[in-house]
Design a protein with these regions (language model features):
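Active-site-proximal substrate-binding groove within the catalytic cores of carbohydrate-active enzymes
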Residues: 1-102, 106, 110-134, 139-143
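Generic C-terminus detector
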Residues: 138-156
């Protein structure tokens, strides 16, 4: 981080601690051994997506980013690469609102800002051909414009 920690609130400091712990836990996959895939080009369209898959294809982290939020748009199908077709995977994601949205009480009138978790199972073929379904509502909860989602994918 390149920021002045003395200017952060206690909730922001806790968020930084969680992010550092996540990076330490997944450093081997993200920085050393993982195969990197660009799933959606950041230079074309409104979306961007990347994933990192372990060499033995038992673990992956996928990241989805949007530029601008579309109101009343359909679901997104975020297609992955590099998984084993016949392997069953558990996909998890934290769909809780961003810290900024949680602390903005005006938004509570229009959005359900309770914490929300995604967890389901799918085969690699499904994840690569059909994709992870992403609801626009979840992107609005995460921040709307410039929202992002991080998916943890583990073989069962």
């Amino acid at each position: 981080y390149e920021l002045d920690l003395t200017l952060l609130s206690s909730s922001e400091i806790e968020e930084v601690k969680r992010e550092i712990a996540f990076m330490k836990e997944h450093r081997k996959l993200l920085q050393i051994e993982g195969d990197f895939y660009r799933l959606l080009s950041p230079f074309e369209g409104n979306e961007c997506g990347f994933s990192v898959v372990s060499p033995n294809k038992t673990e992956a982290i996928a990241m989805y980013f949007q530029k601008l939020n579309f109101v009343n748009a359909s679901w997104i199908r975020f297609k992955l690469k590099g998984l084993r077709e016949n392997t069953l995977y558990r996909i998890t994601a934290d769909l809780s609102p961003s810290l900024e949205r949680k602390e903005n009480t005006v938004l509570h009138a229009g959005y359900n800002l309770k914490d929300k978790q995604l967890s389901y199972e799918a085969y690699g073929a499904e994840l690569m051909e059909i994709g992870i379904p992403i609801a626009r509502e979840d992107l609005s909860r995460k921040g709307g414009d410039f929202a992002s989602l991080l998916f943890l994918i583990n073989a069962i």
